[in-house]
Every structure is written in structure tokens, then in C-alpha cells.
Amino acid sequence: NEIVFSKVSNQIIHEKYGGVVPELASREHEKLLPTMLRDCLYQLKISLIEVDCIAVTQGPGLAGSLIAGVSFAKGLSLGSGIPIIGINHLEAHIYVNILSDRDLDFPFVCLLVSGGHTQLWLVKELGKYTLLGQTRDDAAGEAFDKGARILGLGYPGGPEIEKIAKKGNSDLINFPRALMVKGNLEFSFSGLKTSLLYYCKENKKTNINDIAA
């Protein structure tokens, strides 16, 4: 199996807010899903009746966006007779690695970083997992978004910070790293975010590229 076509909508509507606004996200889902489906079918040169199954995220995630996606998928299923499968969005992130790495065998350890989640899982076999550790506060993505806002950068924060960090000196500033203790598999990003905030207030002349690095 393989991914034959993928289409992603941009998140520019959230940029001025510095993060995802749930109400706006759900409205954008409702508006863009029909167009994105048409684009996918057009690019693949197939019709909807040639689709064998519809998979849709049923959670976890923002309630409004989930409802928009599930409602759209159910409508397609009822109208076409194509069966529908509800997908756990975190499980999907785990299993997509098998598509990209054919040599990946069970068991394996997966670092799952998605939206509000930063977790470390032991994947024993299909459907069997053990949570080894997770963030105690902010997820990595949230920390990037908040960090970018502190630095006056755009949204989403991760790519914006990465872009300027490549131009900076990563050895110049030593920000603290939390929970760096042997045997501890959990994460914490709130302390790093706070350190960044105070550093920027006290060192306004420091090159922003070096701070990001």
C-alpha cells in the first residue's frame, strides 16, 4: 500500500491569532473539504464510485473540526454506499511510518508529535501499545507556536523558527533542558518557553537567528 495523492490546506487564516482558533478551523474544514476532494479525484483521474472505503478521523482533536470531517465523510458514505471507517488520529500517525519505511518491524518505539500531543510509545504489534512518556505541560507544537509569538514570527511557529535558526549559532545561548534525567522518558517545554520570554526581554539586541538556533 502507498499514499498515491495528498493535499494539504494552508493555515494562514490562523496566523494573526498566533495559534489555531477552533471556530475558524471548523468553518474552514466545512468550506474546503468538498473542493479538496474534487481536486484529489481530478488529479488521480478517478470518480468517487471507484473508491473502496472512506477513512475519517474520529478523534482525538478539536470537536468542531472533527464534527465537520465526520459529517462530510458520512454524507459521502450515505450518498455513494461506500463503507466508512473511523480512525484514531494518533494511531494513524504511528502507522504511517510503516508506509514510509517498509523495513520497520514490530516492536518499535515511536515519538508522536502532533498538535497538542507529544508522546513516546512502544508499539508492540497492531493495536497494542504502551505509553512510555509524554509531555507534562505544553506539547512541542504549542511550544513552537508560543516561542514564535515571543520572537515576533508568524504561524505556524515550527517552520518559522526553523527558517531563521538555520542562520544562527546554536552554541551561543544555552537554554535549559527539562527532565534530562536517566530513566525519565517524559517531556516538559513550559520552562523553556519561560526562559525564552525572559531572555528576549533582557537581551533585546541579541540576534534573533541565534536565539532561534
Language model: regions and residue ranges:
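Short, well-ordered alpha-helices that flank and scaffold nucleotide-derived cofactor binding pockets
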Residues: K74, L78, V96-S100, R149, ...
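Conserved phosphate-binding catalytic cores of ATP/NTP-utilizing and phosphoryl-transfer enzymes
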Residues: G86-V109
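Short Gly/Thr/Asp-enriched flexible loops that form oxyanion-binding sites at enzyme active sites
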Residues: V56-G81
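Short beta-strand segments
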Residues: A55-T57, N88, V109-S114, W121
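A short glycine/serine-rich beta->alpha loop
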Residues: G18-L24, V56-A63, T130-T135, V181-L185
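N-terminal beta-alpha supersecondary unit
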Residues: N1-P60, H89, H93, A212
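A short helix-loop
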Residues: V4-S6, D105, L112-V113, L120-N209
